[in-house]
Amino acid sequence: VTEAEFQQQIIDTARLLGWRCYHTFDSRRSEAGFPDLVLVRDRVVHLEVKSETGRLSPEQADWIAAINAAGGTALVVRPSMWEEIVASLKRR
C-alpha cells in the first residue's frame, strides 16, 4: 500500500466514524513539516502518515514535538498500526 492510499484509507474511515478531516493538498506552499492530516471530532488529532519504511524529516519531528508539548495530540502512523488507528478513531 502506498502512503497516498494509506492516507486515503485513514480519511475514509475517519469520516465514516464522524471525524472532520483536513489535508493540505499542495503542502509545498505551507509550513515545512506540518502533519499530513488534522482530524476533529471530540478531540483534535494531527497525523503524520508514513509508509512502513518512511522516515520523518527534522521539520516533521519538530512539529510533532511542538504539538504534543502544547498539550495536543500528534502521531506518526504506519500501515502496520491499522487496528490501533481504527480503535483510536472509534474511542470517545
Q: Residues of each region from the PLM?
A:
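Catalytic phosphate/metal-binding cores of nucleic-acid and nucleotide-processing enzymes, i.e., regions
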Residues: 1-92
